[in-house]
Amino acid sequence: YQWGVYYRKDIFDANGISVPTTWDEFVAACATLKAAGVTPITIGSKYLWTTAGVFDYLNLRTNGYEFHMALTKGEIPYTDPRVHAVFDKWDELVKPGYFLENHASLAWQEAIPPMINGEAAMYVMGNFSVALFKEGGLTNDNLGFFQFPEITPGIPMAEEAPTDTMHIASGAKNKTDAKRFLIFLSRADVQEEMNKTLGQL
């Protein structure tokens, strides 16, 4: 399931904001929204994986895919100056107050209502959030999506796209039924039912 930036098209239009493709444009859009009384970015960071997604994009766009993979494999320490540069970019969003207030007390789902009711304009999130946006009344007319913008020119635009998988443990005591269960889960009709809840492809 891919990640990126979901945004309120109508709020962007009302404030004369075009979809940002560079970091400077993104930060400028945040400043315009903040000045208009709109929280630029909603987030729920009660469970920290949501902030990991933001970090991943900042690092991928600042240092590139190969660096990011080496960092996450432990081959490069988080004390590396290039990682400091990532947090410097994050500071450009945190210090001016571009994230939702009190986000540390909210789960990711609880950060969706501010965007639905127009208090916030963007959410860096996966496509599983779309079902909740639409349940809240947003439509394709006012809900848009854009690629996280470029930070370091020339670095290829790698994407955040986790994959959820299910496996049988090597030491499982009932591998026969576990295999039957995985076969059941892989049926098209079961996948269709699961995806009604998960909101994923």
Predicted ranges, named:
Residues A14-N15, D88, P96, E135-Q200:
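Extracytoplasmic/periplasmic substrate-recognition and gating elements
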Residues W23-A28, E101-I116:
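Short helix-initiation/N-cap motifs at beta->coil->alpha
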Residues I11-F12, A31-A35, Q109-Y123:
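Short helices/loops that flank or line small-molecule/ion binding pockets
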Residues A14-V19, K73, E92-A107, E119, ...:
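A local structural motif
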Residues T42, A121-G126, G144-F146:
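Paired acidic/hydrophobic, glycine-rich loop segments that form the ligand-binding mouth/hinge
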Residues C30-T32, K73-A104, F148:
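Glycine-centered hinge/linker elements that transmit conformational signals in sensory
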